């Protein structure tokens, strides 16, 4: 089953400095029938104006993954962590028992991100943050695991949940597959490009909730950049 969510039907808000679209209920957008997809709780599509951002604010008991589509995001938190994550790379934050952080676009151009929240396997624990560059060529034509709660994904950033976050790029006409498993919940968003997922067309920034599909087959109708969450 593929549940398509067109980008222009997503909830959202325009704060001037921040233009946000919400794949699931978030902040002022609330739909009791659209709260989550399995353990995936939030997928926000954010555009952040130059030299603006999110001032210090708290989080707890959530795995928060930021995928940078364009520009860069600079993170700073009360643990002393600081880092700049650029387009195509990810940062992860395990909020655990509580963390306070800020995220700013310190670049001269608009930064575009996907911010993904996944419920953890257990509450509490020491908070942590990490970021890592991923060679862009490695994900050409196939999915590469960027963040994972599984120990055998040794090259991925660790998260404390039964989930993976994956990225891929496809040239027009290319096809790739991913063995999801019928007991898993997948959510796929093309950051760019038009694709078909098991025969369902997705435009750029549309969402596709995927359940009861052992394997997903993605064909690029034009050059595409993909982000996939495989969650419980």
UniProtKB/Swiss-Prot annotation:
Gene3D superfamilies reported for this sequence: Jelly Rolls (2.60.120.10)
Source organism: Caulobacter vibrioides (strain ATCC 19089 / CIP 103742 / CB 15) (Caulobacter crescentus)
Coiled coil: none
Recorded family membership: Belongs to the pirin family.
Alphabetical list of Pfam families matching this protein: Pirin, Pirin_C_2
Name this polypeptide is given: Pirin-like protein CC_1473
Classification via InterPro entries: Pirin (IPR012093), Pirin_N_dom (IPR003829), Quercetinase_C (IPR041602), RmlC-like_jellyroll (IPR014710), RmlC_Cupin_sf (IPR011051)
Lineage: superkingdom: Bacteria
